[in-house]
Amino acid sequence: MKDGLLRSLIYLATALTVSILFIIIGFILYKGVPGISVDFLTRSWDDKTTFVNVKADAGRTGEGDEGYIPALGITVKEGDKNLVISKIEKNSPAKKAVNMKNVSYVLKKDDTISKIGSDNTEDLSFKDAVKLLQSSNGTLRLKVTRPGGGIIPMFVSTIYIILLSLVVAGPIGISAAIYLNEYAKPGRVLNSIRFAIQNLAGIPSIIYGLFGMLLFVQTLKMQYSILAGSLTLSILLLPTIISTTEEALKEIPRSYREGSYGLGATKLQTIAKIILPGALPGILVAVILSIGRIVGESAALIFTAGTIAQIPEGLVGGKASAATLTTKMYWLIKESGDLSAASSIAVVLLVLIILLNVASKMITRAFLKRTGNG
């Protein structure tokens, strides 16, 4: 009777857990998948307005729709007060446009033209604006706005922060775990260190964010930057990496160490050739857990990396501030309540985590085969 009741409770708890998981994922997919498109994945988040120079080719001829501009190799349509590029020919001069710094700025479909020379398109009728473009010769200056709504800046920033955080926290955490398991003498000091590590794992991430802001952003003058955010996350990840790696090292049988010493290997050689390769699957778990923590973190990054949707142009400084996918999700819900866009970002996050985990396992498997441990 008691066994049957206990078994029923276990089944009920399992079914409830799995159901909640499927409901959450199903809701995210239902709300998010319709909003995912090529533009969503490849565009910048904010609209970008630029003045460009385009050299019209008067020798180009042809017929097309009402908004066809032969000299530029484009077709425009009427937008909201402006012209919208609807088609671009393969060899269009518009693909050779340059900005005011004489840097290539290829015009694309859906770009909006709001100014032709000194004339604002909103002050012209559609026909007059098209005639103005068709009658233009030589170099033509256009004010072009590229529509946003894409996640590419946040996606790139997320990858940068994942890599930087793991590069810093990985070696430090693994080295600390090796010391605690292989070198440190059992006693009060070791127990105190492990107790401190366990307590660090339980500190709210917003506390790490405040610490990172005070130390990296203000004291070390890094400003809001991906380096400040990555260093803050590195500190946050250390307890997870140390604890998980140490548990993996403990799983290596004592006989492996003794056999290596018996063959004349030093302790360092034993660690490098025997213990670490054997513990690699467990270390991989630490890396996967760390990736999940980084991708899901927002509080610490808001205080250190900032919330600007841009691709960082350095590690520190004004142009190094960047929002990750998670921080952008937070601001979307907070500022505009756009649940659909936030869900679309969540779908991308799920796919990103899966791909990174698969890549980690493939790299580990290849390493184990190469070293003869697979």
Over which residues does each language-model region extend?
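C-terminal transmembrane helix and the adjacent membrane-cytosol boundary/short C-terminal tail
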Residues: 246-250, 254, 288, 330-374
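PDZ-domain C-terminal substructure recognizer with occasional recognition of PDZ-binding tails
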Residues: 108, 114-115, 124-147
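PDZ/PDZ-like domain segments forming the peptide/carboxylate-binding groove
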Residues: 56-115, 119-122
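Interhelical loop and adjacent transmembrane-helix boundary motif
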Residues: 302-350
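Transmembrane alpha-helices
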Residues: 244, 267-305
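Generic hydrophobic transmembrane alpha-helix motif, especially the helices
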Residues: 198-233
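Transmembrane-helix boundary motif in ABC transporter permease subunits
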Residues: 165-197, 361-366
